[in-house]
Amino acid sequence: QAWLAAGLPESVPAVTIDRKCGSTQQAMDFAAQGVIAGAYDVVIAGGVEMMSRVAMGSNSMGKDNFGALHCMRYPDGLVHQGISAELVASHWDIDRQSLDAFAHRSHQLAAEAAARGITGRDIVAIGNADSDEGVRADTSLKKLSQLKPAFVNEKMIERYPEIAWRVTAGNSSQVSDGASAMLIASEHAVERLRLKPRATLSHFAVAGDDPIMMLTGIIPATRKLLARADLLLDDIDLFEVNEAFSSVVLAWMRELGVGENKVNVNGGALALGHPLGASGGRLTANLLGALEETGGRYGLQTMCEAGGMANATLIERLD
């Protein structure tokens, strides 16, 4: 009912999309694809999440929601994302210090971007909420190093003895409330409505990967998108890779050979939070703001999702 609450005409239709963490990015991609196909003129693509209202895991309540065939394929069961983040850290041999250092970087960059007004231009104040509340400009490596591993589990210790238990609340994304929205329009609609376009969306990719490692789908999704766009990594000016956990982004960087000077340059979910269904729009806003500030042309946005899925989207800044 969000579009009715927003005051849009009753003649305007709406649909709910569920791709977990990538829901808003997928909504954006579907909207752009519909515009490119000529099916739509103007679309509002957005998402919302109130994580403070719903307890994590409350949708299952300890029951098997997947059925016998799923159990036959994965007899030991899937794992939650915290364990997947630990598996990623172990697989790529990412130590605790590197995880914490990346989290510290995120808070520092987010605070600096807010001070410059780069992120604030895309924030619409709702009541007294007019800035991202999760940014901790005063955090330190010492404080982060004192946090205990967040996902230690006796059953998982036995199942995965290779895990060194390095993932903490500090190097994981925050539980957050948030919403985001983007206006996507055809070239004809832009001219007719006298809008000023900021960017174009031209290439898209979705990939699936190991559902137990889960968070690594961003690697094949990135490669798939670049192949479709006939671009190289060096052609991309900036990347926005969702900071679900430090280990996820660091593994992506190591696997693809991308330097951190191009990645999440205005901070990410470790500092800004990760309201699941809304995060795609926040990534786009951060990426576009950074491209506008630096004069870059191409930005690539990618988001890991439940079940080993990931979205990737190519953004081209317009002058």
Give the label of every model feature segment.
Residues 98-188, 192, 255, 260-262:
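N-terminal extracellular/periplasmic Venus flytrap/periplasmic-binding protein-like
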Residues 42-91:
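Flexible glycine-/small-residue-enriched beta->alpha junction loops
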Residues 1-6, 10-13, 21, 87-96, ...:
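Conserved active-site "lid/cap" helical segment
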